[in-house]
UniProtKB/Swiss-Prot annotation:
Entry keyword set: ATP-binding, Cell membrane, Membrane, Nucleotide-binding, Repeat, Translocase, Transport
Protein name as annotated: Putative ABC transporter ATP-binding protein SCO2324
EC number: 7.-.-.-
InterPro entries cross-referenced by the UniProt entry: AAA+_ATPase, ABC_transporter-like_ATP-bd, ABC_transporter-like_CS, ABC_transpr_CbiO/EcfA_su, ECF_ABC_transporter_ATP-bd, P-loop_NTPase
The species this protein was found in: Streptomyces coelicolor (strain ATCC BAA-471 / A3(2) / M145)
BP term (GO), one: transmembrane transport
Physiological role: Probably part of an ABC transporter complex. Responsible for energy coupling to the transport system.
Residue ranges of every copy of the ABC transporter domain listed in the record: 2-243, 317-545
Protein's UniProt keywords contain Aminoacyl-tRNA synthetase: no
Plastid is among the record's keywords: no
GO molecular function (one): transmembrane transporter activity
Length: 563
């Protein structure tokens, strides 16, 4: 169904091909996983299937890509639209209508399908992806994960023969990700749909793959094979495979079920051994930054008096009885949360639970409808942005919101100036997080993971006492996640408070002191990470599921205990 024949792609201005010697075939009715570190060209390979590369992106494609017998060099994307449905890393770039139901119908309207067929397929897709309650909602009011489900649904309704998905579960909570992957598996098995998918969170998808195409490094030829065979030599692999490598299991397990069947000897070796703690207790607070200049004029006009911004507080962040309403949606209600200096807190919960709204309240982007919010000694929504930036930094779900320069070098230089940091500080952070990003590249030409890493570096340059991160591992491979965790752990040890909203249960297990679970805008659990995640089948990391009932969370803990 999809055939790559010795394909190389070189973008305009590049001296070397982004991908080279790509040669593989995806048979009809198979799900093939495209894996590899960040920046190796996975999105380029996916883009070539639908003709976006090179017709839209520019550059030179050598070799041949055919889809259902159509050569993508001679067929433009619109001439492949009846065969190929594509969902990229950025769902927002797909939307052309305002509401969920209209978006699901748009692709079918473009293909001229009869109204009765369109109505039936919209209803089917709403049910399949759990979108029925959102059918009339404006897309702009949805959470990132809800938008991702709508984007996937919009390419399912036309019933294409080929689905091309670039990190389709990156913004989904664990339960929603399982639902989407189950739908894809049903399409593959029952309808013969062909799926080519790139995904960094291999722990979610590896068990569904018929084959894996591994891009080991930029410009290197891919390795193709059965999932277990490729994972045995892959530089990127899920925790269950890492545990199997450590224990010497062969063949390597790809599922929790298979790993548990073979874990009894490992449990016996670990019996009585202390579980290492990789999240030391919070440290002493940082010195207080200069007092902010509050924005008070509009409050005085209303006869209100602003709260004293200099009132002492032992917390880096303090939320009391917080309620936030966004349009017609009650996003948060009765939320109480405190974060101490040096503490790392993971906000978790279903898509639309209110995690991003809570971060927005902490950085002053939304105003409480009830209750109070403090970031250190500042009231965020009443503090001038130039003062607030030195107290709290936010890396949003869409990193492009922070990037405006024409090159990586200019972006880093601006970050150094804005933070009064030594020249080269941002660049050094970027190189530590993700080596190999050149100074002269435009931020828009980076992969999603590379863009996120650049935005992280820009915010971390100011070293704010309170650091907020919204889905910080979206688009990052395991090595980049490990480097990010190391940097965040170092910041916490210096007294920085960190609050991250994430669906990445492995990151929460590795990094967080506490996990706060949100549901429908309310806090339903708040406690030590090991207690909260292990108690939940949805949020327990892979190692915890394999080695239960003891609270082992990461492969690193097991490795340290065995040495």
């Amino acid at each position: 169904m999809i055939r790559f024949e010795d394909v190389s792609v070189t973008y305009d201005g590049a001296t070397e091909p982004t991908v080279r010697a790509v040669d593989f075939e995806v048979p009809e009715g198979e799900l093939v996983l495209l894996a590899g570190p960040s920046g190796v060209g996975k999105s380029t390979v996916l883009g070539a299937v639908g003709g976006l590369v090179p017709h839209f992106t520019g550059g030179t494609l050598r070799g041949r890509v055919t889809v259902a017998g159509r050569d993508t060099r001679t067929h433009k994307p619109r001439e492949l639209a009846d065969v190929v449905g594509t969902v990229g890393q950025d769902p927002l770039s797909h939307f052309v209508t305002d509401t969920v139901e209209d978006e699901l119908a748009y692709g079918m309207e473009s293909l001229g399908l009869p109204p009765d067929v369109m109505r039936r397929r919209v209803e089917e897709t709403l049910d399949l992806l759990g979108l029925s309650d959102l059918r009339s909602r404006p897309i702009a009011t949805l959470s990132g994960g809800q938008q991702q489900r709508v984007a996937i649904g919009s390419v399912l309704t036309p019933h294409p023969d080929v689905l091309v998905l670039d990190e389709p579960t990156s913004a989904l909570d664990p339960a929603a990700a399982e639902e989407v992957l189950a739908v894809l598996q049903r399409l593959v098995h029952d309808l013969g749909t062909t799926v080519l998918m790139a995904e960094h969170r291999l722990e979610r998808v590896i068990q569904y793959a018929d084959q894996v195409v591994l891009l080991p490094a930029p410009g290197e030829a891919p390795l193709i094979g059965a999932p277990a065979e490729v994972m045995a030599v892959s530089p990127v692999y899920p925790p269950v495979v890492g545990l199997g490598r450590l224990a010497g299991w062969s063949p390597l397990p790809l599922t929790i079920r298979n790993a548990r069947r073979r874990a009894a000897p490992l449990r016996e070796r670990l019996a009585g051994r202390e579980i290492p703690d990789h999240t030391p207790p919070p440290s002493a607070p940082l010195p207080a930054p200069p007092a902010p200049r509050p924005v008070t004029s509009r409050w005085r006009r209303r006869g209100k008096r602003p709260e004293n911004p200099s009132a002492p507080t032992p917390y880096a962040a303090e939320v009391r009885s917080l309620a936030v309403r966004r349009d017609r949606v009650q996003a948060l209600r009765h939320v109480d949360l405190t974060v101490s200096p040096g503490e790392t807190v993971a906000l978790m919960g279903r898509n639309g639970a209110g995690k991003s709204t809570l971060l927005s309240a902490l950085v002053g982007l939304v105003e409480p409808s009830a209750g109070s919010v403090r970031a250190g000694d500042a009231v965020p929504h009443r503090t001038a942005p130039r003062d607030l930036v030195r107290r709290v930094g936010l890396v949003p779900q869409e990193p492009r919101d922070l990037l405006y320069a024409d090159t990586v070098a200019a972006e880093c230089a601006a970050a150094d100036r804005d933070a009064d940091a030594a020249p080269g500080t941002c660049r050094a952070l970027l190189s530590e997080l993700l080596p190999g990003i050149t100074d002269d590249i435009h931020p828009r030409d980076l992969s999603e993971g590379q863009r996120l890493t650049l935005a992280l570096s820009v915010v971390l340059t100011a070293r704010p006492p309170l650091l907020l991160l919204d889905e910080p591992t979206r688009g990052l491979d395991y090595a980049a996640k490990a480097r990010l965790a190391g940097i965040l752990r170092g910041l916490a040890a210096e007294g920085h408070a960190i609050v991250l909203a994430t669906h990445d249960v492995e990151l929460a297990a590795e990094l967080a002191h506490r996990v706060v679970l949100l549901a429908e805008g309310e806090v339903i659990a708040d406690g030590p990470a090991a207690d909260v995640v292990v108690a939940s089948p949805s949020y327990a990391p892979q190692v915890a599921k394999v080695l239960a009932p003891r609270k082992w969370l990461t492969v690193a803990q097991v490795r340290e205990a065995l040495t």
